[in-house]
């Protein structure tokens, strides 16, 4: 999963307006190829948590479950979009991540909402943001990790974009 964070950082560097991004682009593409080669388990149609390992516990939220949606969270260009949708649907059904169950791991994992944003899952993303607002914004319960707040902000931005697209699509269909 850390490899996806590195990939995303390099991707963002490419977009940052630097003059020469050729070396960055080459490194990012190599990492992308290695992520696909090492972590995609084609036989079992899932992402591995450790390269070339059959370790997998479908009832474990972290790392096993989260690994299935981590490529979505970091906007990794997954080749098999239908397979990724199946993994996302299984993750959502199995773990109900939008409820922000802190008891599960001691951590909110608000970042899972980015997977919903990538899948266009407005309902679950709205539920996540609503649960976050209800549980953590009223009294600013400690600890409010800045990382969690940051993910919520990014997810709200994505949600805004999803609503914009939905409105534009609706108007086009009505015209």
Task: Please place each PLM-identified region on the residue numbering.
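CBM-like carbohydrate-recognition segments
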Residues: 39, 60, 72-175
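Extended ligand-binding clefts on enzyme/binding-domain cores
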Residues: 1-8, 12, 16-109, 117
